[in-house]
Amino acid sequence: MPAFRYLIVLPLLCWGFASQAETTPQSRLKSFLDSARTLQADFTQVRLDESGRPRQESGGSFYLQRPGKFRWDYTKPYRQQIVSSGGKVWFYDVDLEQVTAKRLGQAVGSTPALLLSGEMALEDNFTIEDQGTEEGMYWIKLVPKSEEGGFRYVLIGLEGDKLAGMELSDNFGQLTRIYFANLRTGITLDPKLFQFSPPAGVDVFEDK
């Protein structure tokens, strides 16, 4: 398996509260996930070391269509793509000319976005906790019930009825934070966004 430079994300994604009377993190998360089927946003991703200092910043565009389809287009500092069509997740490093493919269920540790794609029973697989409000966002914490999750926890930050931020803590103690801007939901997305074929001449690795 090649060493990829992905800072994933993550992540994670969906949106919108149905009622302010729903006060548990489980009900808020469910309302958030059920209220929209598509999403498009710009994102900035910052990877932090164990002391909380920024190590690398990246950014690009994110697209999601539930269930199971998402796409991260990284444009800086390196060109990378992460594409799920609902069956496989493709990781493409443009500069290294390398592609790896994973089955959707195997990709959670690499693409936390899968958690909110509608493909997993969250309450069966994660402990869901209320983290209160900070930086103007209401935070929900997801902790894997299995040690094989590939990460310690994921935080989802909601600002009103919009996805505003995410934080991933991996098993090596590193934090990845993602901030969203120019977010739109309930829009029509081009089906081609979620299609991927490895370009000619690239190295392709596939997890069995």
Curated annotation (Swiss-Prot):
<dbReference type="GO" id="GO:0044874">
    <property type="term" value="P:lipoprotein localization to outer membrane"/>
</dbReference>
<dbReference type="GO" id="GO:0042953">
    <property type="term" value="P:lipoprotein transport"/>
</dbReference>
<comment type="similarity">
    <text>Belongs to the LolA family.</text>
</comment>
<feature type="signal peptide">
    <location>
        <begin position="1"/>
        <end position="21"/>
    </location>
</feature>
<dbReference type="GO" id="GO:0042597">
    <property type="term" value="C:periplasmic space"/>
</dbReference>
<keyword id="KW-0732">Signal</keyword>
<dbReference type="InterPro" id="IPR004564">
    <property type="entry name" value="OM_lipoprot_carrier_LolA-like"/>
</dbReference>
<dbReference type="InterPro" id="IPR029046">
    <property type="entry name" value="LolA/LolB/LppX"/>
</dbReference>
<keyword id="KW-0574">Periplasm</keyword>
<keyword id="KW-0653">Protein transport</keyword>
<keyword id="KW-0813">Transport</keyword>
<comment type="function">
    <text>Participates in the translocation of lipoproteins from the inner membrane to the outer membrane. Only forms a complex with a lipoprotein if the residue after the N-terminal Cys is not an aspartate (The Asp acts as a targeting signal to indicate that the lipoprotein should stay in the inner membrane).</text>
</comment>
<keyword id="KW-0143">Chaperone</keyword>
<protein>
    <recommendedName>
        <fullName>Outer-membrane lipoprotein carrier protein</fullName>
    </recommendedName>
</protein>
<dbReference type="InterPro" id="IPR018323">
    <property type="entry name" value="OM_lipoprot_carrier_LolA_Pbac"/>
</dbReference>
<dbReference type="Pfam" id="PF03548">
    <property type="entry name" value="LolA"/>
</dbReference>
<comment type="subunit">
    <text>Monomer.</text>
</comment>
